[in-house]
Amino acid sequence: MAVVTMKQLLDSGTHFGHQTRRWNPKMKRFIFTDRNGIYIIDLQQTLTFIDKAYEFVKETVAHGGTVLFVGTKKQAQESIAAEATRVGMPYVNQRWLGGMLTNFSTVHKRLQRLKELEAMEQTGGFEGRTKKEILGLTREKNKLERSLGGIRDMSKVPSAIWVVDTNKEHIAVGEARKLGIPVIAILDTNCDPDEVDYPIPGNDDAIRSAALLTKVIASAVAEGLQARAGVGRGDGKPEVEAAEPLAEWEQELLASATATAAPTEAGAPEPTTDPS
């Protein structure tokens, strides 16, 4: 069964790249065409790469690995936190702190401090202190919670990272590559594919696109966790809310993809030839 369908990708605007004057030439092979000065991503390739990334994430988690979800841009913050939390994985959706991976021993000490402050607050450890001291400790706790709350239970560097917008998260990507940690990421038309091990060509600026692809990765994690626990496979297809009707040209793309897929796999739910 298809992990995600061409229709879902189109509904989410995953096929829209950047303006033609803002692009990385290395992305040329992932571009289907351009329309009104906007690059249109080849969603047929997107589907293929989604399957590869999905399988990698599923197998990584099934064998005891963890995936760190990273997306600090406004459009990704909510879905990154929600999907990572849904499958019990660590996440960073606020500012990436330099050294979060390459200097994890120091970060781990800050996590211990966060837990210490939380325990103090919950067990009355703030009692007997001056208002100024309590205020200082509370501010310290809140600051740590804001920057490290998503990785509070991460005891070691992750097995892989999922990234929304590799340009914005270039520090995270650089640290992962330095440590040999596989990078799975959305590749918009202004990104560098050489920095990513498991690319998914797509729109990393639209909220719906980032949410859909993040949900796909989280579903792969969920399936990996099921395999690890010896539970049967569930339906990995992510649910998507109803979308705006497709434009006529987008309907043509979908029809073209479906028509091409039909002879190959009759009745297969996954379209096979779509531009974007």
Curated annotation (Swiss-Prot):
Statement: the UniProt record of this protein carries the keyword Ribonucleoprotein: yes
Keywords: Ribonucleoprotein, Ribosomal protein
Gene: rpsB
HAMAP family noted in UniProt: Ribosomal_uS2_B (MF_00291_B)
Spans annotated as Disordered: 255-276
InterPro entries referenced in this protein's UniProt entry, alphabetically: Ribosomal_uS2, Ribosomal_uS2_bac/mit/plastid, Ribosomal_uS2_CS, Ribosomal_uS2_flav_dom_sf
GO CC term (a single one): cytosolic small ribosomal subunit
Protein name according to UniProt: Small ribosomal subunit protein uS2
GO MF annotation terms: structural constituent of ribosome
Superkingdom per UniProt: Bacteria
One GO term of the biological process aspect: translation
Family: Belongs to the universal ribosomal protein uS2 family.
PROSITE patterns on file: RIBOSOMAL_S2_1 (PS00962)
